[in-house]
Regions:
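Conserved micro-motifs of the catalytic ATP-binding
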Residues: 25-30, 69-74
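Short alpha-helical segment of the dimerization/phosphotransfer core of two-component systems
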Residues: 5-10
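A conserved beta-strand-to-alpha-helix junction within the catalytic ATP-binding
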Residues: 31-49
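Short alpha-helical Gxxx[C/S/T] motif in the catalytic ATP-binding
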Residues: 150, 154
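Short conserved segment of the HATPase_c
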Residues: 123-135
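Short helix-loop "hinge" at the ATP-lid/N-box region of the Bergerat-fold HATPase_c
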Residues: 90-91
């Protein structure tokens, strides 16, 4: 009886949390404005390089295709959160001394493409859409426990920006690639 009561309580908490996120998304849409995401992403990469060089000797390489502006309708701190969560994930699956690459580019069809590529172990699953589901985690025990919410939050924030995200394994080498495609303004 106590166990079923606790299960119901946890289900209510999850439902309340989901509703809170939906409400936040609705409010966030009102706060959207034209922003250049390039300096935001570059700043996050610089901050991480200062931390990770000391922590795991991981180097994060940043590159853009030379365009001056990468303008989207968005919310600055949410873009930071997307990049931060993805870098945290890449770092956690990377060994000491490995590299992570962050690229931003514009396409001819009015899209802005952000890629985060690591040299870690890559994804185990063939269907990488699973990794964006709430509470999904495939981490080996050696990586410690995680909530399985990080990539789900990323997916929700990407959706908020009317963007898309795709996870793939690198074909020629070990590692994973995350690609976000934003509509350009």
């Amino acid at each position: 009886n106590i166990l079923s009561h606790d299960v119901l309580r946890i289900e209510r908490l999850i439902t309340d949390y989901s509703q809170m996120l939906k409400d936040e998304v609705a409010l966030s849409k009102e706060k959207m404005k034209k922003i250049n995401i390039e300096p935001i992403i570059q700043s996050v990469v610089e901050d991480y390089n200062n931390i990770q060089t000391v922590k795991k000797n991981i180097k994060i390489h940043y590159e853009n295709d030379g365009n001056e502006k990468y303008i989207i309708n968005g919310i600055e701190n949410r873009i930071e959160q997307i990049i931060t969560n993805l870098l945290d994930n890449s770092i956690s699956f990377s060994k000491e001394g490995q590299n992570i690459f962050v690229n931003i580019s514009s396409s001819f069809d009015r899209k802005i493409i952000v890629k985060i590529i690591d040299e870690g172990q890559g994804f185990k699953e063939n269907d990488t859409t699973k990794i964006f589901k709430r509470f999904y985690s495939n981490r080996p025990d050696k990586f410690g426990e995680h909530s399985g919410l990080g990539l789900n939050i990323v997916k929700n924030l990407v959706d908020l920006h009317n963007a898309s995200i795709k996870a793939t394994n690198r074909l020629s080498q070990k590692g994973a690639s995350m690609e976000i495609i934003f509509p350009k303004v």
